[in-house]
């Protein structure tokens, strides 16, 4: 079965992918929760109410993903796509040698007895392999499935599952680290938990039925907004994290990407007020959400305009 083949692929590396995902999520957990509490001003628990949203790193592939991967012509394609970063590195190294071959041979006192031909053949082979795997478009193949393939927030339980196998595949295909992708997936799912269950100052949260029926552009957009936010906050210490977020974003469907249309136009406080208003007023439609956000922006600008300056 496909699951066992992928397990073998991801476990044959120096450090098992599952262990990397587990460690990355464990290290990220508290920092992400603290960020979400600060940015949303929402609390999962308070003195009179104990609420937990645990996460688990789990085995397995969603059936829809398994069916997509079974369409690949050969297992070797999966291996090569997951190892794209190594192919890119090899291609760059061969190009470097090719451009400086004469000096390299002189430095090592070697004769050019076919090295140029061998290099050209190797370069051509890697280029052909990269062309072939680029045609398959593994990230789109996985990420355009209308199902949570790397992680899921189960709002009725509540709890989070992180799927290490798809994370390993997508990280390799996008040439980003498993650590960074694990962080991003956990942050996204925890953002769902905080926007849903987090209590505001009036001890109000998003009604579960309303949360479940709200347009995905709202629910996923808010989760993406706060995921991008923590990646930006950590950029000075880990610049690769934000780059990984944007690499992933390039391959995701509209519910995960459309937040960029409003994220850069509105301050985080405007988004926070919009989140609270959406929950309190049972807003389900995306156009209503956008209208609320624009109204809040105008009110804040109006208030700022009439307040006396602090001189």
Tell what function each PLM region has:
Residues 75-181, 190, 196-202:
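Active-site scaffold of zinc-dependent metalloenzymes
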Residues 210-244:
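Post-HExxH zinc-binding segment in Zn-dependent metallohydrolases
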Residues 245-311:
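Pan-zinc metallopeptidase signature
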């Amino acid at each position: 079965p496909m699951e066992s083949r992928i397990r073998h692929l991801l476990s044959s590396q120096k450090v098992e992918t599952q262990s990397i995902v587990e460690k990355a999520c464990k290290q990220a957990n508290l920092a992400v929760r603290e960020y979400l509490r600060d940015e949303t001003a929402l609390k999962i628990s308070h003195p009179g109410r104990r609420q937990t949203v645990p996460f688990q790193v789990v085995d397995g592939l969603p059936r829809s993903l398994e069916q997509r991967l079974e369409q690949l012509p050969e297992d070797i394609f999966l291996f090569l796509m997951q190892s794209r970063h190594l192919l890119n590195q090899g291609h760059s190294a061969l190009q470097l040698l090719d451009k400086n071959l004469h000096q390299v041979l002189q430095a090592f006192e070697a004769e050019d007895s076919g090295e140029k031909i061998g290099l050209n053949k190797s370069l051509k082979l890697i280029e052909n392999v990269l062309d072939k795997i680029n045609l398959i478009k593994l990230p789109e193949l996985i990420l355009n499935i209308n199902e949570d393939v790397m992680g899921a927030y189960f709002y009725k339980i509540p709890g989070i599952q992180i799927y290490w196998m798809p994370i390993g595949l997508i990280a390799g295909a996008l040439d980003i680290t498993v650590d960074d992708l694990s962080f991003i997936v956990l942050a996204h799912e925890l953002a769902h938990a905080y926007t849903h269950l987090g209590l505001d100052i009036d001890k109000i949260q998003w009604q579960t039925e309303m949360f479940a029926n709200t347009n995905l552009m709202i629910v996923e957009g808010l989760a993406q907004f706060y995921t991008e936010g923590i990646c930006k906050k950590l950029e000075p210490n880990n610049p690769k994290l934000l780059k990984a977020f944007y690499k992933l974003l390039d391959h995701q469907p509209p519910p995960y990407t459309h937040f960029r249309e409003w994220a850069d136009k509105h301050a985080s406080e405007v988004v926070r007020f919009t989140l609270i208003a959406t929950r309190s007023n049972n807003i389900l439609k995306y156009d209503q959400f956008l209208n609320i956000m624009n109204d809040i922006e105008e009110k804040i600008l109006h208030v700022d305009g009439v307040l006396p300056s602090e001189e």
